[in-house]
Amino acid sequence: MRLARKIVRQLRRGARHEVQSYYRRQPVLSNVVFYESFAGNGVLCNPEAIFRALLADPEFAHLSHVWALRSKHENRNVVREFAHDRRVRFVRTGSVGYFRALARSGWLVNNATFPTEFSKRPGQTYLNTWHGTPLKKMGYDINDPASRVANVVRNFLQADYLVAANPFMIEQMYERAHRLDNIFGGKIIDEGYPRIDLQFIDDAEREAGRARVADTLGIELGERKIILYAPTWKGTNFNRPEDDIDELLDRVTELRRGIDESRYVVVLKSHQVVHRFAAGRPGLKGVLFPNELPTNALLAVTDILVTDYSSIFFDFLATGRPIAFLTPDIDDYAGYRGLYFEPDEWPGPVARSVPQLVETLRDIDENGVSEAVRARHLSMRERFASREDGGATSRIVDIVFRGKTEGYRVVDTARDGKKSLLIYTGGMRPNGITSSMINLLNAVDYGRFDVTVVFPNSYRPVVVAKQGELNPQARQLARVGGMNGSKVTHLRRRLSWFTHNLVSHRTSAAQRKLWDEEWRRCFGGARFDEVIDFSGYGPFFSTLLLHAPDAERSIWLHNDMVSDAHRVTRGRRRHLRDLLGVFSLYRDFDHLVSVSASLNEINRAKLARWANPARFRFARNLANVETVLDNAAVPVRTAVIDPDTGETPPWASRLVRGSARKTFVTAGRLSEEKNHARLLDAFANVHRMHPDTQLVIVGSGPLLDALEHRAHVLGVSDAVIFTGHQSNPHAIMAASDCFVLSSNYEGQPMVLLEALMVGLPIVTVAFGAVADAVPEGSALIVSQDVEGLVEGMNAFLDGHVAAVPFDAEAYNREAISEFYQAIGATAGGESA
């Protein structure tokens, strides 16, 4: 049964994919406007204001209007309103009709985000209005993984126009919180918020509005004033909004008991997330304002607004009426989410409990607000609502639909003239490439370069943790969603991978279109001066980066790539197919960058059939000096505590640098190319002659069981420590006496530089790129066999291999200069 359900889901997904692909091949309809608000929750917010303005304007009578609704039943009043208007129709979010409208409409209007499948087509104009000036921190200003903001940023980058209610939205929300400065290719409209136009009404309209509120709630309003309670959503689980509803109900009940209901009526406007759950609570009958009606129409007749962290108060500023805040959880909430303004800056008194709020409201009724509050209110109104005059909608229609910009505030995002880099990091798993990426981003001159990194979306804790180590000055983009295109097109793409010949991405018109569309889906209108595949192991991102418009293209070669392609792990050449595909793309890259000069020559020779020899360059990886030294200073017994049990493994007590028992250490993935088997064979020989020795192998990998068995067969199990993966290998290295490397091949093993930084003598086999792996004279290089390793370890025990001083800062200065030269970012770009 489970398999059957899985097959059905896959068939449905495949069918939907084909439908989307079909409609994306059809012409764009310039006379159709497609609207979505709050993911289909209603005909609401800024999109509604624009929709009604276009519908009422005879100049736009030729336009058809399509609204996305999650439920027609929950929006039955508005559906009924337009039931006989042939220009208006409704589609269910996620339906065939939805994706048809999304693919074919010439105009797209949203106040949040379209789904990850969305990619704006040529001929479409996308207006994203967003849904409020934020008090709560947004985007990258919250210390959440990039995946949480990925689709928002992706939508913004697709947009032709973004709407800002005020300059703060431009500078703080768009440019900083969502990092659009330097890369956004569209325009930002700074002409006020369309939805706020509803608040500018005359006395007759106000009376009519009050009557509509009374009729909607089924209450007698009379002369009573309206207190609107409009809290934000503060839950952490969108699947359990009832947790928030219970709290809402209690507060509303307590508030109603505390006020004089002969003079006031309390109206609740719940957040979009919880409304349909709140609507079923009997205790909120006659209080809860319907979700399908415009909030700003309610604000127009509200006498006092009570909120917490909702952006609604920025809208209400335009009325000049009192605002009060109820924030019993402010200490926890401000610490968890973060706020752009402290409570003492808010335009109203702040209550920490409902009884305190009741007293505040009574004071406002009897005495008005204090002079200090009035001053804050006026200041914030000038800062955040100065554009609001009831005409924002008409101005935005002028700009977007008539193409008139003269006399309007239509601006670009900030540009500082820096060279822009887009770097694919790889999968961000804990490995040498990820460490090198982190080190590089810590060394880049952000005064000269605007840096964006992109990586596959992942929720794995170990990957998210590594993403968190990236320098925060680099903009992070997580690739979410999948490619568009028909199944036939994707079949041809996959067949090209099986034949190890990916050149069809540029030689086939259909494949070129597929990849160009994927670039636009991921990056919208963003433009980069340089794109860099820092991983160099995955054909997908290698191909994708080649479709960056007008960019220099570089790809990193972290190893002897031909040898790595033929590396056998558990009887299989796991990298062969992918790397042969990547090799076929080398001719399309401007720079092929190895991580050392000698490795550059190896790759230049071995890859001659795939790439122009003149395009090979080198740039050594950087060392993370501060982290290594800080880690090394941690006592080993502290560094290796098991986070699950809180216990220190018994072997930690055996690691004492300089003791009579000499400790050899190595660190790296337990895989074929590291050849730990050869190291074990050599150590067994040394240990027989010097029983007071031990070997520590730091790392994990597929060969762990085989290596443990080999140590047992060799009779050295008691003298060999397998630590498994360690978050701080440097503390273990610092507690050892000599570092040993036994690899078949390496690119530039950073572990050797780290060994130098912690002051270890080094014995290493003569792998192909060893000449550039460490500074000359800083390691004993031995033959790449058991005998060579035995000779090297014995030489250390005899006092002939010593630690050598290493100037890591000088090394890093040279390495970052090589990076700039390798990507052509400085004069004399050819470095080898």
Residue map of PLM features:
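Conserved catalytic-core segment of nucleotide-activated headgroup transferases in glycan assembly
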Residues: 45-51, 194-278, 629-660, 671-699
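Nucleotide-activated donor-binding/catalytic signature segment of Leloir-type glycosyltransferases, i.e.
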Residues: 83-85, 274-291, 473-481, 708-724
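Membrane-proximal helix-turn-helix segments that form the acceptor-binding/catalytic region
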Residues: 99, 147-162, 518-525, 561, ...
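A short, active-site helix/loop in glycosyltransferases that binds the activated sugar's phosphate group
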Residues: 161-185, 564, 587-618, 623-638
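Short hydrophobic beta-strand element within catalytic cores of glycosyltransferases
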Residues: 305-306, 322-333, 761-764
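Conserved acidic donor-binding segment of nucleotide-sugar-dependent glycosyltransferases
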Residues: 349-354, 776-787, 794-800
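A charged, aromatic-enriched C-terminal amphipathic alpha-helix characteristic of glycosyltransferases
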Residues: 372-396, 801-830
